[in-house]
UniProtKB/Swiss-Prot annotation:
Disulfide bonds: 34-57, 37-86, 54-107, 58-109, 85-112
UniProt entry keywords in alphabetical sequence: Disulfide bond, Glycoprotein, Hormone, Secreted, Signal
Family of the protein in this entry: Belongs to the glycoprotein hormones subunit alpha family.
Protein name: Glycoprotein hormones alpha chain
A single BP term in Gene Ontology: G protein-coupled receptor signaling pathway
Main location: secreted
Xref: Pfam families: Hormone_6 (PF00236)
Residues bearing glycans: 78, 103
Quaternary assembly: Heterodimer. Glycoprotein hormones are heterodimers composed of a common alpha chain described here and a unique beta chain which confers their biological specificity to the different hormones.
GO molecular function: follicle-stimulating hormone activity
Taxonomic source organism: Morone saxatilis (Striped bass)
GO cellular component: extracellular space; follicle-stimulating hormone complex
Residues spanning the signal sequence: 1-23
Subcellular location: Secreted
């Protein structure tokens, strides 16, 4: 009788573990908190008419600088980084409360022109 209880308890525990594992989200958590590069309504400038701007994340990575490349640098840096930014493919200029802003119409990941310091 004791072995039946033990087997039943083991089966119950295994079922619970499988339930927990199955309910765990199976998604890429590397970019958690940063959505894909898309058009979003800018709440600051969207007073009398909607103004859309590109927001979101794209590709970025950092890796050790190859020795051959470090020898060519005027100021050697141990880490090299690459990145693409969420930028507007198409946009047009509009005026909101006397301020000229760009209303984006399409976004994509491309070369970063402006970097945050």
């Amino acid at each position: 009788m004791g072995s039946v209880k033990s087997a039943g308890l083991s089966l119950l525990l295994l079922s619970f573990i499988l339930y927990v594992v199955d309910s765990y989200p199976s998604m890429d958590l590397s970019n958690m908190g940063c959505e894909e590069c898309t058009l979003r309504k800018n709440s600051v400038f969207s007073r009398d008419r909607p103004v859309y701007q590109c927001m979101g994340c794209c590709f970025s990575r950092a890796y050790p600088t190859p020795l051959k490349a470090m020898k060519t640098m005027t100021i050697p840096k141990n880490i090299t980084s690459e990145a693409t930014c969420c930028v507007a493919k198409h946009s047009y200029e509009t005026e909101v409360a006397g301020i000229k802003v760009r209303n984006h119409t399409d976004c994509h990941c491309s070369t970063c022109y402006f970097h945050k310091i």
